[in-house]
């Protein structure tokens, strides 16, 4: 087990329903420390760049439209095996298939409006953190 950093984004559906605190509680109860957090509304350009790996997929346009539909909360999380731990507490992408007690099962509304995004690998975590945060914004 190693200490890692990972990226998390609380999505517009959760923000609209005032679930930021609830999501943060799930993360912190799993032993993840929030070392950076900020709220913003992504531009279309930012969303397209962030989700560039999905550009050829049929859901790309609706994903960009959804993620820019309202504010998001961007986070850097730190903890032992943080990437795997965050993926576990988030639950399956589709809330209908997620385990009880996970963020997506308990808060998510649909496969798109599933309340949270999290890095799926070390490379993704590094890229996603660097995309949104300066080193000076990450407070240990």
UniProtKB/Swiss-Prot annotation:
It catalyses: a 2'-deoxyribonucleoside 5'-diphosphate + ATP = a 2'-deoxyribonucleoside 5'-triphosphate + ADP; a ribonucleoside 5'-diphosphate + ATP = a ribonucleoside 5'-triphosphate + ADP. The active site is at residue 117. The keyword Cytoplasm applies. Its cofactor is Mg(2+). It holds the Pfam family NDK. It is found in: Cytoplasm. One of its GO terms (biological process) is GTP biosynthetic process. NCBIfam families: PRK00668.1. Homotetramer. Belongs to the NDK family. This is Nucleoside diphosphate kinase. It comes from Rickettsia bellii (strain OSU 85-389). The lineage of its organism: Bacteria, Pseudomonadati, Pseudomonadota, Alphaproteobacteria, Rickettsiales.
């Amino acid at each position: 087990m190693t200490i890692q950093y990972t990226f998390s984004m609380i999505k517009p559906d959760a923000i609209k329903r005032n679930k930021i605190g609830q999501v943060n509680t799930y993360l912190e109860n799993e032993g993840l420390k929030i070392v950076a957090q900020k709220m913003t509304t992504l531009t279309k350009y930012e969303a397209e760049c962030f989700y560039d790996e999905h550009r050829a997929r049929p859901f790309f346009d609706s994903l960009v439209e959804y993620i820019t539909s309202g504010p998001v909360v961007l986070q850097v999380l730190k903890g032992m095996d943080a990437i795997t731990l965050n993926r576990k507490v988030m639950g399956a992408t589709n809330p209908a298939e997620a385990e009880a007690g996970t963020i997506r099962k308990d808060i998510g509304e649909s496969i798109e409006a599933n309340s949270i995004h999290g890095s799926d690998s070390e490379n993704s975590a590094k890229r996603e953190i660097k995309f949104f945060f300066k080193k000076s914004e990450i407070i240990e």
